[in-house]
Amino acid sequence: MPPHRTHRTRRHPMTLAQRFARFAANLELDTIPAPALDKARACVLNGYGIALGSHPTPFFGVAEHAVLAMDGEREDGATLLGSGRRSTVAGAALANAALFHGRAQEDTCGVAHFGAILLPLLTALVERGEGRIEDFLPALVAGYEVGGALEAAYSPLTTAAGLRASPLYGTVAAAAAAARLWRLPEDRTAAALANAASFAGGILQSFGDGTDEWRYQVGMAGRNGLAAATLAASGSVSAAGAFEGRSGFVRAFVRTECDVDAIAGQLGKDWSILKVTFKPYPVCALNQTPVRASLALREQLGGQADAVRAVRIHLNPTVVGYAGMDKEGPFESVSGTLMSIQFCVATTLLHGAPTIAHMTAFDDAGVLGLIPRIRPLADPALGLLSCRIEADVDGRAEPVVVQMHTDHTEYSYDRAGVSALVRRIGEETGVAPSAYDHIEKFAQALPHADLGDVLAAFGTIQTAR
């Protein structure tokens, strides 16, 4: 491994890759604020808990089949958590991410789902002995912070251009996490991030078409981030200006100049992981508040959704413009229904809190009949997670109005809240309570946890499959 290089005699300002690397490589448990560590443990619990509850979904099986075809089965490999078979670390990162992403209830940082990328990767690496469990939390936080800094700065522009934040910024996050887990020195960490900037991408069209590519993008981000870090550890010569250079990440994907100081200056001050949100319902993160508002409206209507003549739902323009959100159907997959504002609102008004069963009822006559009466409207005065519903109802002279000015704090649960959420999902999907006992023990014990608890938890769903 190349020797550590100091920056004391550097003539030019540090690049963004170098500043990210300095931050990530020097992250330690005692330099991460206690609230950020607590939130990281909540993210761990949520990630594993949602993956357990995703065992009935088909996406892991597809990814596992592909992994075994590409990488083969390895007796001494990393566990494919949905089946108990073993393959390469890269293979486990891909297959297991499809399980973590199976219900679409993974955590969200802005509009990116870093947990479904980072946790499968770090789990596989630690299981294979390619990293210490004591470095698990700092590596996880490094991924959230580096990926989150880019997402916060640029996702409104890249999302509008049709690029999905999770693979675009998650590939860089995964490289940061792997580099920190391996304790790569700053110069090799910078190389890992530069490599990841070259390997990142991912489009949103699958949401518009209601197809499944997005289910596998998170695993590919982990796999590509792993490759980026492995190449760096092996001595790759990588572009220092990978992010802000003339043909770098920011100009290529965002079509703007990169403000290195503005992005790097927030590291260690404005912690991205503290803004991570969790999803109470199996719908897109941007549909969580519309569902909550619809539940409130349903209560006011006494469950009589058939009396609704028209619904106007005002949302942030990013929400309305996001691929697949403003869509009336037809629907042939849950990838389409969980994104559609109209479907989510209609099924909630008719049936209450949505379940996977509700989201897969593509021919529900009541829902399909209500959808044409629901109209999403862009309102720049509303935040990303806020909404206002106005419903015209038979027998009422004035519209029934529900308004929710919500931000990330509404969905930023502590571990107790996460535990209640994932156990509720387990009841819905038939997961043994002991599985959640195991992952709670693991999250609580970090940084001195036993990964055997995680493997034991997933052993319960392997038997079920």
Protein language model features and the residues they cover:
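Terminal-appendage/accessory-domain detector
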Residues: 10-111, 213-223, 230-465
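Aromatic-lined, polymer-binding surfaces characteristic
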Residues: 146-172, 178, 218
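Hydrophobic alpha-helical hairpins/lids featuring a short glycine-rich hinge
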Residues: 97-152
